[in-house]
């Protein structure tokens, strides 16, 4: 009997430590497992906050993953490249481009309202010519502005016919060529334009380059879409304000030739020919006409300002057929704005919220 009790006690004590150890290990094991899961979950949430989603332009900065923690959130846009920006905004292989310096931000906003009404605003890429424009646009509309160095002086680029204005416009063919080399269709617009209809519906066929005539003389509604014959001075007057290009060898050749023509002539205050990029564009068109498939857009759909704002009878006769109106044939920032206001085309005052930029201060 005593032996049985001794064995029982021994058995009880010998099993107790292992049993106690087994039980005490369970909560520690469970706690470790749950803690690990919670740690992983917290890490995933933290990465979700710090890292942008793949479709965001911020995702395009692989070496700047901590940019959201940077004391200067604007600085990341200095590293934003044209290739990154084009990839971000392109829709159906197409980018809509404008080039803007900060004094013309109100005109950019006005143009954007009209583009938004045609549901094409997501394709827009603003090529900022100064850092004020780069930061302002990307603050309001992240990823839709890029600056291609060097930045220009906004004040000198403000006045039509100045050397600053010439330098501002002279970079245009280089920007467009870069986008073509990336494989995108590209539409260029000046921002002193207003869309009344969808211009993409009027890009008939599959030509290399589409453009508009800057002459105010009225053409027949069924006029030729070939490059007009030069006048007796050997000049054509195609506008460099609205151009559509496909990524073809012909379009690339045209941009290269345009750039060459600009580089071959220095700016001259006394010579109108050298005061902006349009004469060089016409030279390039005429020199490459036999190598590039060119298409002159309809005058009634894309009228120059010299016709639309100066021939009221024609405007009434062709009412409903206008697609993009260009506020040219007038010089001066305030005069352009007033003319838009007089014709009900200054949309910013009452419709700013229709722009992706909203109200600009």
From Swiss-Prot:
Protein name: UDP-D-xylose:L-fucose alpha-1,3-D-xylosyltransferase 1
Subcellular location: Golgi apparatus membrane
Function: Catalyzes the transfer of D-xylose from UDP-alpha-D-xylose onto L-fucose. Probably involved in the biosynthesis of rhamnogalacturonan II (RG-II) through xylosylation of the internal fucose moiety of the A-chain of RG-II, a structurally complex pectic polysaccharide of the primary cell wall. RG-II is essential for the cell wall integrity of rapidly growing tissues such as roots and pollen tube growth and elongation.
Enzyme class per UniProt: transferase
Organism: Arabidopsis thaliana (Mouse-ear cress)
GO cellular component: Golgi apparatus; Golgi membrane
Tissue expression summary: Expressed in roots, rosette leaves, cauline leaves and stems.
Gene Ontology MF term list: UDP-xylosyltransferase activity
This protein's UniProt keywords: Cell wall biogenesis/degradation, Glycoprotein, Glycosyltransferase, Golgi apparatus, Membrane, Signal-anchor, Transferase, Transmembrane, Transmembrane helix
